[in-house]
Structure formats: C-alpha cells, structure tokens
Regions:
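Post-signal peptide N-terminal segment of secreted/secretory-pathway proteins
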Residues: 65-66, 70-135
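Coil residues (strongly favoring Ser/Thr
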Residues: 8, 20, 45, 67, ...
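Structural recognition of the beta-strand scaffold that forms the well-ordered cores
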Residues: 89, 115-118, 162-164, 173-176, ...
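Active-site signature of cysteine proteases
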Residues: 210-452
Length: 452
C-alpha cells in the first residue's frame, strides 16, 4: 500500500513538473491570475497621475550635488548646439578654445561650428558617393547598399571627424561664420542633402565608368550650393582682432582659416591625441577600426584601443590635474536629471518601486542595445576622495545655460563607469604600457555595428 502511494505521489510530482515546464506561446487566464497575485494591491497611486520619474526621483540625492572639484580646468561660458547633432564638433572645439582663452586671457570666444559643419557635410557627401561607386556592382538591396541609401549621411560624428576637418580646412572665429537658422536646427537641411545624394547615387549606379567623376562632381556642386544658401560662404580670408577679456586689442591681422588654425591651435590633432573605447563586449587591449566612419575620404577610419574603465579614469584624472580637458561620449539619456544637470545611477529606483528587477551589467546593456553612445561632451573637472579616487566629474555641456549650473553638469563616478563609451585624451597622459598597443593592426568592425 505504501509503495503504491509512493509511486502515485512520484507520478503526480512528475506530471506537475512536466506541466510546470510546459511552453505556452500565448497569454491565458492562469497567467494573468498569477501576474495579478504577484503584483499585489498596495500600489503608489502617484504613478497613476504623474510622470514615473518625477515620483521615483531621489530628491535628497539631488540636493546633495554641487560643482565642487579637486581639479577644474574651464570656467568658460557654455556653447549651444541647439537642435543639431553637432555635439562631437562642439566638444572638440570647446577643448581647443579653452587653451586659447587661457593663453591670451580672453573673454568669451567660440570657434565657428558652422564652418566645421559646412565642410563636414560636403566631405560626408563625397564619401557617400565614393561608397556608391565602390559598391555599385552589388544589388541595391545588398546589406551595404541598403545601409548607404537608408541614411546617406548624418550630422553626428566623433573626435577624429573633427580633427580631419580642422586639419584640412582650418578654423575661423564664430563671428566670421556665425550660426544660421539651418545650423541651429538642421533637420530640413540634412533631409534635403540626403535627397540629393540618393538621386545622384542612383545615377552613379547606372552610369558608365567614364562618367562617374563628372556625375560625382555635379552632385557635390549641388550640395555645395545647398550649403551656401543655408549656411553662407565659407571665408577664404578675413580680418580679425584678438582681444583680452577687458576688450583691449592685442593684435589685428588678416587670416586664412589655415593660418588662423596654425596660430591659435597648438596641437597636431592627428598625433597629439589618442582615442579609446570602453566596450566590455569585446576583448580589452585590442585595436579596432570602424568601417566607413571617416568623413574625409582620404583620411583613416575611426580607430581606437578598447580598454577597461579603470585605465580611462586614471588617464582622465591625470589630464585634468594637468589643466587639460578631455573629450568623451556617453549615453546621456540614461539615469539623468536633464534640466538639473545631474547624472547618477541611483537617481530613480523604479525597480524597487515596482517590485521588479531592472539590473543589467554594462556588457548586457550594450549587447541588448539598451544603451548607446548618444552625446559627446568635454570633461573639465573632477572631485577626488581622501584616497585620490574620483567621486564625481564636472562636464562642460553644449546645450546652453539652462541645464545644470549655467550649462555645466555633474556626473557621478559610477554613472560614468557605466555609461561612458568613447574617450579621447592627450597622448602625454597615456600610460607607457598602452603605447605599444596603439601600433597593432586593428580589427575591422562592420559599418552597421550598432555600438559605433
């Protein structure tokens, strides 16, 4: 009898076990009943009437933030990229203007972002057209051609793109080529350029080899005309007076964009800076190159060394200690109080409020496309604890004075470790152990890699 009961019990357990593991491709009543029981009935009613992030915001944490730094480089008035994706250009130029302002004791000064934007769009257009020529024998629906025609060019970029434009075309003061309606809000300009590029792209695919160059140059002439109508003529020569912060004239000269660059930008941007990445989905201490990531066709694609965050933080602190700002990009859409200018992983504990788990590692977030490199900025300060470890970082943003502290924003160290992607620093702050790695042959990453 006991044996029969035991066998029956084991059978029930087996049946229950099989039943519990049964796959269902649809939601049934049993599931929703379990969901309801799991959720419970004691809920915070504020979530029904208010923005979830307003309800979950840790206001005590927000109140604890300030801009106190152990080392701070820039106190400059912030710039404003407005409704454009030119953060990479703004942050690069913000780093370069800081050295110029400091050297000559200047007041507010900006390099022309419109000048850089003009040439960047023209160069990206040329790269697109050359890519079309390179792949014109492949079907139009081949992956590379689908990628090209889906978005022929964009207004985004990275430090290497800015370096290429500055080296090739020089720089000018903002007042020489100021911001225009279509630089501050470039959506329709970019759409128009893309329309023209798609049209000429199809012509190139159908053309004889002997006609390719003339068609390409006609396309670029049209793009140039569109840019001039919306952004103005880029100057070939101009007169400009260097003044100190009191308005006293130091010198007045006639410049070209290249002579202006040579006088006021002391760096060889191609060689004085090193580009790094923190991507835990790929092996560290290896070089990578992103296919078709350059703007100027004759320059190299964006190439970087992938390193752990500890290396990046060490170089970052060393850079700021020596009065040198650095360039970086991060997912600034994550765990942030935008107008308050605070970035902290503990700002909102929605998982705890809802009784669910939202935790993921950085590697998991990158692999699942949860996070991406969304915005490039210039780092200008850091607060260290008693042991010399970074606690928080101060950023010179490029969205005007309305966010944070007159446009400066603060990032918790843990936030930076979690959401930083790209990092560019002067070569003199790179540890000796990393320098030989920069000479290694990079592995090529495909154009459509979503992380880059």
């Amino acid at each position: 009898m006991c044996k029969k009961l035991l066998v029956s019990a084991l059978g029930l357990i087996l049946v229950f076990s099989v039943s519990a593991q049964e796959r269902k491709k649809f939601i049934d009543r049993q599931m929703t009943d379990r969901f309801r029981e799991h959720t419970g009935t004691v809920l915070d009613s504020r979530f029904l009437e208010q923005d979830m992030y307003e309800v979950a915001l840790d206001r005590e944490l927000v109140a604890s933030y300030d801009t106190v730094c152990t080392y701070r480089v820039s106190h400059n008035q912030v710039t404003d990229q407005m409704k454009s994706g030119r953060c990479w250009l703004f942050s690069t130029l913000n780093i370069l203007r800081e050295e110029m302002i400091r050297e000559y004791d200047m007041g507010h000064f900006e390099f022309s972002q419109t000048h850089g934007m003009f040439w960047d769009i023209l160069e990206k257009s040329n790269r697109f057209l050359e890519n079309v020529i390179d792949y014109r024998k492949k079907p139009i629906d081949a992956r590379i051609n689908a990628w090209l025609f889906r978005k022929p060019i964009g207004d985004g970029g990275h430090f290497a793109n800015a370096a290429h434009i500055i080296e090739k075309y020089g720089v000018v003061p903002q007042e020489i080529m100021p911001e225009r309606f279509s630089s501050l809000d470039n959506k329709w300009l970019m759409n128009l350029v893309r329309t023209s590029l798609r049209r000429y792209g199809l012509k190139l695919r159908d053309a004889d080899a002997k006609d390719l160059q003339s068609i390409k140059e006609t396309a670029l002439s049209d793009i140039y005309s569109i840019l001039v109508h919306n952004l103005g003529h880029p100057p070939t020569e101009f007169e400009w007076s260097l003044k100190d912060k009191e308005g006293n004239v130091i010198s007045t000269k006639t410049y070209t964009p290249q002579s202006f660059r040579q006088e006021f930008i002391k760096h060889d941007l191609e060689n004085d800076y090193v580009i790094f990445m923190n991507d835990p989905t790929k092996p560290y201490y290896r070089m990578y190159r992103v296919e078709n990531s350059r703007n100027c066709y004759e320059y190299a694609d964006w190439t970087f060394l992938n390193v752990p965050m500890d290396d990046i933080l060490t170089m970052g602190v060393e850079s700021l200690k020596n009065n040198s700002m650095f360039y970086f990009s991060a997912d600034t859409d994550a765990s942030m109080l935008m107008m308050g200018g605070i970035y902290d992983v503990a700002l909102y504990d929605l998982g705890k409020r809802y009784g669910v788990s939202l935790d993921m590692t950085k590697e998991e977030m990158i692999r699942s496309l949860e996070i991406k490199s969304a915005h490039a900025i210039a780092m200008t300060g850091v607060e260290l604890d008693a042991d010399g470890k970074p606690v928080k970082w101060l950023v010179e943003n490029s969205f005007g004075k309305v966010r944070g502290w007159d446009g400066y924003v603060v990032m918790q160290n843990e936030w930076l470790k979690t959401y930083l992607f790209r990092f560019t620093v002067e070569r003199r702050f790179v540890p000796e152990k990393l320098l030989p790695l920069l000479e290694r042959k990079p592995r090529v990453l495909k154009t459509w890699n979503p992380t880059y």
